[in-house]
């Protein structure tokens, strides 16, 4: 987990200093990514580091938490991240799977959130929504994130169609590089 301490220092000290040299502010979220949640003990060790960094001025909250392959280990760590966010009174950024079972993962995430009356939906963003998941997230009362990719996944045309159908209330738009 010490490698993550170095990573969190990079995100909260080095990157803001580097960005400032170019006149920019740098902000970050802190968590252990769902792809790394299969080793629950390791993930818990990393999560123990987060309180040390959470009050840094460039930290936005707990994220990008969620699911990757919709496994029980990922769900365990997701729920423990939610506990941490509530305990530390933090915003939450949630990752939905980039897989053919995105719908299943999104439903699992929304089901877990439904059981959390201690989480204010206005403080939760469910990201990487697509046509079949966007309305579910919006109907549940959470912020819906649209991640735009230049040539794959959710392109600008599809995102515009989603916004035309469902409106722009509680929508977060961001971009990512194609892999």
Residue ranges and their predicted role:
Residues 1-100, 104-112, 128-132, 139:
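Mid-domain alpha/beta scaffold segments of enzyme catalytic cores
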Residues 20-22, 115-120, 166-167:
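Short helix-capping segments at alpha-helix termini
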Residues 27-29, 93, 125, 145, ...:
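Structural detector of well-ordered beta-strand residues that form the stable sheet scaffold
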Residues 42-49, 151-166:
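Short, motif-level signal for alpha-helix interfacial/capping segments enriched in acidic residues
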Residues 91, 119-123:
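Short beta-strand/loop segments at the ligand-binding rim of alpha/beta enzyme cores
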Residues 102-111, 134-140, 153-163, 177-179:
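Histidine/acidic-residue-rich catalytic or RNA/ligand-binding cores of hydrolases
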Residues 143-150:
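Short hydrophobic/aromatic-enriched beta-strand-loop microsegments
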């Amino acid at each position: 987990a010490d490698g993550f301490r170095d990573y969190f220092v990079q995100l909260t000290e080095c990157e803001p200093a580097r960005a400032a040299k170019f006149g920019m502010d740098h902000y970050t979220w802190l968590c252990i990514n769902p792809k790394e949640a299969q080793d629950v003990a390791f993930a818990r060790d990393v999560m123990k580091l987060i309180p040390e960094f959470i009050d840094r001025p460039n930290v936005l909250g707990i994220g990008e938490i969620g699911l990757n392959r919709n496994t029980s280990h990922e769900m365990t760590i997701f729920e423990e991240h939610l506990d941490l966010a509530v305990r530390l009174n933090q915003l939450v950024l949630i990752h939905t799977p980039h897989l053919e079972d995105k719908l299943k993962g999104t439903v699992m995430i929304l089901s877990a959130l439904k059981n959390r009356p201690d989480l204010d939906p206005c403080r939760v963003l469910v990201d990487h929504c697509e046509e079949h998941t966007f309305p579910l997230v919006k109907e549940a009362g959470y912020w819906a994130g649209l991640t735009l990719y230049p040539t794959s996944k959710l392109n600008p045309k599809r995102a515009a169609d989603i916004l035309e159908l469902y409106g722009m209330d509680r929508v977060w738009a961001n971009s990512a590089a194609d892999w």
